[in-house]
């Protein structure tokens, strides 16, 4: 963890610590603490299998966010976690089958194929997500530029925040 002291030591290498630098370093340290606390609460939520409202309350407790912001963050994190797990599990299974096929000199397994599903539960669904609902892609291929699956952490935020979509295994 990058502590305030470590950040301050790093800053002193380049310049003397000014009041502005001190304030900036304090903010960075606080953001890191909140980010870590939030990650812990999200993990606790998924381990406990509590209702979605539980995650909203956990987010509010850590961040002090309004109810609407906490709901948006909770929906975003649920989408990211659930679809990320589906993709991760599919990758692991594919690689296991691939290794077994290589050991036994058998035919390589087919790449898993996923279907994008927009459940239309959002008040204002993204037009791009509605348009690709039902589309199928092999694992790892993009459904939209930069978007491999709903909640993809490497995708642009405007494609993932408050997304209600999910992947369904098609093959």
Locations of the language-model features?
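Domain-core detector
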Residues: 1-160, 168-171
